[in-house]
A protein has these predicted regions:
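Non-catalytic terminal/accessory segments
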Residues: 1-192
């Protein structure tokens, strides 16, 4: 549960009220998970012990944002959580794409697209550049896959990257992370 308050004093009062109400229902606040967090941004410039929290897989903390006029400022924004980023990184590693040299790119795309689409649909809603940075790891594994699959690319990862970039230009929708913006040619789309 997240409760917003205008001041620290009001937050302490609200926490006490919530604790009383939960006690009436035979429940109690988890002291380990219950924090008062200062939502630092361009208008709130103070400091507090806790300036970030994780909720539903997102980490909310002060982040740089761009105004509609092109200027940058600090805002309190959600992005994929640190624990979720690590978990997804482990899943990507566990796929061992680079070792599947008997498979085609289409086979690899069919194997991973459903899961990647789920990640992009959920975690890509806010601060998508954090997720794009994570999804570019898939491209690194695909480059290694190309080096294993094709003898002419074996010791030339730059050529393998160009090979994948050519595939992207021919079939930009082959992989879900390419459609999301994690392109194999080193550019990103819509992740600014």
């Amino acid at each position: 549960m997240i409760v917003h308050a205008a001041s620290e004093r009001q937050a302490l009062q609200l926490r006490a009220q919530v604790a009383r109400r939960l006690a009436e229902c035979g429940l109690e606040l988890n002291e380990h998970k219950t924090h008062i967090v200062y939502c630092k941004d361009r208008t709130r410039r103070g400091s507090h012990e806790h300036q970030r929290f994780t909720f539903l897989g997102y980490t909310l903390r002060p982040r740089m944002a761009r105004s509609k006029y092109g200027g940058e400022f600090v805002n309190f924004l959600p992005a994929i959580g640190d624990d979720e980023r690590k978990r997804i990184g482990r899943v990507i590693r566990r796929w061992r794409l680079h070792r599947r040299s008997g498979s085609t790119l289409t086979d690899l795309a069919e194997a991973i697209n459903a899961e990647v689409r789920g990640w992009t649909n959920y975690y890509g809603r806010f601060y998508r550049s954090e997720l794009v940075r994570l999804l570019t790891r898939i491209n690194e594994y695909l480059i290694r896959w190309a080096c294993w699959k094709y003898k002419r690319l074996r010791r030339y990862p730059a050529k393998a990257r160009r090979f994948l970039a050519d595939v992207y230009r021919r079939e930009p929708g082959l992989f879900a992370h390419w459609r999301f913006g994690a392109r194999p040619d080193g550019w990103t789309m819509g992740a600014g």
